[in-house]
Each structure stands twice: as C-alpha cells, then as structure tokens.
Amino acid sequence: MARPLSDRTPGPLLLGGPAGAPPGGGALLGLRSLLQGNSKPKEPASCLLKEKERKATLPSAPVPGPGLETAGPADAPSGAVSGGGSPRGRSGPVAGPSLFAPLLWERTLPFGDVEYVDLDAFLLEHGLPPSPPPPGGLSPAPSPARTPAPSPGPGSCSSSSPRSSPGHAPARATLGAAGGHRAGLTSRDTPSPVDPDTVEVLMTFEPDPADLALSSIPGHETFDPRRHRFSEEELKPQPIMKKARKVQVPEEQKDEKYWSRRYKNNEAAKRSRDARRLKENQISVRAAFLEKENALLRQEVVAVRQELSHYRAVLSRYQAQHGTL
C-alpha cells in the first residue's frame, strides 16, 4: 500500500539538494525516492561523484540549442550559481545531455535541387512496361513545367525552379519513339483485310525452260506461272467443233480465186492451232505450279489446325479454372 503524504520523503529533495550538490542532482534524487516509495534515498555524496565523472567525460563546450539554458563557463565550479532564489528561476549549468548538432527543424531542405523525372522514361530505363497510351491513339500533349511547392517549414525561405539534367533529353527522345511504337501497335490491333492475290507462298518452283518457251508468245514477256491469271472466258471449256465435210472441187474450177481463199483458210487454221496450243501449254505450266503450291498450303493448314486445337485446349483449361474471359 502507498504511504500517507506525511510519511513520504519531504518535498525539498525534489526542488533542491544539499549544499554543494549540482542543481539537478536533488531533483533526480527526489524523483527516484518518490518512485521507489519506502526505499531510502541514496547518499548525495555518491550522486555528486557520479555527476562529476559524467561531466568529465563530456566535452568542455557543448553547443547549445534553441530553447535550452546556456551553460556557464567551463572553469566555474559545478555548484556555483549566478543568483539566489529557487533553481527553477535562476540560470546555471544544465544537468543532462547536450546537443552537438543543429536541430531537425533548423535544417534547410534543398527544395530547389529536386529533379523531376518522367515516369515513362523511368520505367523504360528499368525495363518495365510503359504506361498505356491515351484513348484515341493520340500522343499525350507535353506537360508544362512544374514548379515545386515550397515547404511551410521555417527553414524554407525560397524555392528555385527545377533543373533539368542533360541525361533526360535522350530519355525523352526514346519515350517519343516508344510512343510512336505504341501507336503503331494500337493501329495493328484490328488488321486490315489482305488481298489474296498479293499473298505469296514461300516455295521453290523451277519450271522447264522449254515449257516456258512454248508457253510464251514470241516477242513478248516470258510467261510467269506464279503471277499469271486467266480470265473466266479462257478457263471455260471449249466446245469441240465438227470438221466440215470436204468438198471435192474439180480441177478445171481451181482458179486463182480458189487458191487465194484456200491459202487464207490455211493461215487462219494455223493461227488458231498455235493459239490453242499456247493456251494449253500455259495452263499446264500454271497447273503444275498450283499443284505444288496447293500441297504446301495443305501442310500449313494441317499445322495451323493442330496449333488451333492446342490453343483451344489451353483456353478451355483456363476458363475451367478462372472462368470465362
């Protein structure tokens, strides 16, 4: 149980110690006796010796801080005071640790030396994906120069504009190139329709030069089975024309007009046969190319179908675990 107030240690020990003791020694001794209760306070002489040993280890001229009492001269005795009265009202040496550095609130933070770094440039330097482009595929407008807000602390007197280091210029140029690359990726999200006539299959097809010569018109460009396209009329099957019945002409009627007409008919028949053979040769060479191309395309279709079935299986497993997309 706590003792009554009359039995406790008298109050003078809290305010001041015995004569010759340091001003703070009595207060510490009274506080300790108040906390210990019935225990007997220690002798002032031992406290005085410990106080002298502690002061001997400390430097002779501590740096005072704001709001603290200024210590007296170094050669003054520890028990000397400058005036009478209670220890709270007079100035003297302060018992307790002294500050050897300026206080935190007295430091002036270098707000003017802060450099602002672009977020996208920082992400690109560290190998991280940049921020997504704004909607519409438009490049973001350059942000105006930002001025740092001054701190409300007492040490901040003025703030200067942020300085841009020369290393930021290539980073911004890289950022612009990356922005254009992202815009290109956005435009390729919905691919434009591809003309089938412009698609070329990677294959090796070397036709016989004699076949190409028979398939080409003399004096014109060499027939190319890869690029040549036949019209619908040319691909239609030609009807078989019945040969006309041969008419026997007597020898006395074979005049010059007859031979002229006969010569013209023979020339027309020869031209028709040559054109028909040329067309047949072109179709045969073109068909050989298309057969080989068709075989390669069938192999590609089989590979694409296998890949599609694999990705469908992966998608079905993902949807079974995480739900539909």
Swiss-Prot record:
Assembly and oligomerization: Binds DNA as a homodimer or a heterodimer. Can form a heterodimer with TEF.
Top-level taxon of origin: Eukaryota
Gene expressing this chain: Dbp
Every bZIP domain range: 255-318
Region annotation Disordered: where it falls in the sequence: 1-98, 124-203, 230-256
Compositionally skewed regions (Pro residues) per UniProt: 129-153
Name this protein carries in UniProt: D site-binding protein
Residues carrying Phosphoserine: 86
Record key words, sorted: Activator, Biological rhythms, DNA-binding, Nucleus, Phosphoprotein, Transcription, Transcription regulation
Record region (Basic motif): 257-279
Composition skew (Gly residues), residue ranges: 17-28
GO molecular function: DNA-binding transcription activator activity, RNA polymerase II-specific; RNA polymerase II transcription regulatory region sequence-specific DNA binding
Segments of this protein annotated with the region Leucine-zipper: 283-297
Family: Belongs to the bZIP family. PAR subfamily.
Organism of origin: Mus musculus (Mouse)
Single GO biological process annotation from the record: liver development
